[in-house]
């Protein structure tokens, strides 16, 4: 069964296949089911980009979308996530997309359910589809991963985006650096090396900024926000020192004038809205992989 839970479960070949399908969709290829197929979106945390991106992807593929509301469901009566998924499975749903506040919520589910789980983000743990759309954006820009230098900057400790990207990009041959306030370093993430931001600015090919996750911080940590942009954000002055041909990325939502100067969000280097566009194509590819009997499947040569 083609769950998509973490980037660690995907080989280089599987990543390449997903990216190739996503590129095909980006180039106008159509793939649409002619049989009624239900997919459920279960979002237990707030989301704009991921939720709507999945829904657009599902509808482009001709899938019938069930949007689950935890507040209006039997979760409020104590129903477990397992029972919710089994209920959806029993009434004919063929796959579930889940975002949940619990790290690795899927560990207790993946071997017990009979339909694919597509992880749309688990707590501070993993965000595989965000990683895949980031990979697609980088590949479109540079045509490769091998030898690229990539800085992941900001709230590394709380970021599922940092974990997924650092692991996958290292696997694909890129060199990863982190820049972060001391309070937000993640010493358990061994896929990169910490360096001062101002050393990285003129060196890296990709400046990947992370959202400051106010909802996961205590009061003490929130106090440093006043100085964050000056010390740890991408200011206009820092952008001017970036190397020629380098790009700016951010998973969004963006805290303007915190992680990045507002005037840089749509500057020439920025690929922030391109990432959002690519999210639809990647999620179409991931759904195709999860539902091969409905949407078909194809194999591609390794192109990383």
Curated annotation (Swiss-Prot):
Carbamoyl phosphate binds at residues 49-50, 99, 127, 130, 252-253. Transmembrane segments: none annotated. L-aspartate binds at residues 77, 160, 211. It comes from the Bacteria. It catalyses: carbamoyl phosphate + L-aspartate = N-carbamoyl-L-aspartate + phosphate + H(+). Belongs to the aspartate/ornithine carbamoyltransferase superfamily. ATCase family. Heterododecamer (2C3:3R2) of six catalytic PyrB chains organized as two trimers (C3), and six regulatory PyrI chains organized as three dimers (R2). Catalyzes the condensation of carbamoyl phosphate and aspartate to form carbamoyl aspartate and inorganic phosphate, the committed step in the de novo pyrimidine nucleotide biosynthesis pathway. This is Aspartate carbamoyltransferase catalytic subunit. It comes from Bacillus cereus (strain 03BB102).
């Amino acid at each position: 069964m083609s769950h998509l839970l973490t980037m660690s479960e995907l080989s280089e070949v599987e990543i390449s296949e997903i990216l190739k399908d996503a590129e095909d969709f980006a180039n106008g290829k159509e793939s649409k089911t002619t049989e009624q197929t239900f997919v459920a979106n279960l979002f237990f945390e707030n989301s704009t980009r991921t939720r709507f991106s999945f829904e657009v992807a599902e509808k482009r593929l001709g899938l019938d979308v069930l949007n689950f509301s935890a507040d209006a469901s039997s979760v409020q009566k104590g129903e477990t996530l397992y029972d919710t998924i089994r209920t959806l499975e029993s009434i004919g749903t063929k796959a579930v997309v889940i975002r949940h506040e619990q790290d690795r919520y899927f560990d207790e589910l993946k071997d017990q359910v009979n339909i694919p789980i597509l992880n749309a983000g688990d707590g501070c743990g993993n965000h595989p589809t965000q990683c895949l759309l980031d990979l697609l954006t980088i590949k479109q820009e540079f045509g490769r991963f091998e030898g690229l230098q990539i800085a992941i900057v900001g709230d590394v400790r709380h970021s599922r985006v940092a974990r997924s990207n650092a692991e996958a990009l290292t696997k694909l041959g890129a060199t990863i650096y982190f820049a972060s306030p001391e309070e937000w370093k993640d010493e358990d993430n061994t896929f990169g090396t910490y360096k001062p931001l101002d050393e990285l600015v003129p060196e890296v090919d990709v400046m990947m900024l992370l959202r400051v996750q106010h909802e996961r911080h205590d009061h003490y940590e929130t106090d440093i926000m006043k100085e964050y942009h000056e010390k740890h954000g991408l200011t206009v002055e820092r952008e001017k020192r970036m190397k020629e041909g380098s790009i700016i990325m951010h998973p969004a939502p963006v805290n303007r004038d915190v992680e990045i100067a507002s005037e840089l969000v749509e500057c020439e280097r920025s690929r922030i809205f391109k990432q959002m566009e690519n999210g639809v194509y990647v999620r179409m590819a991931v759904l195709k992989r999860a539902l091969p009997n409905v949407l078909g499947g194809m194999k591609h040569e390794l192109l990383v």
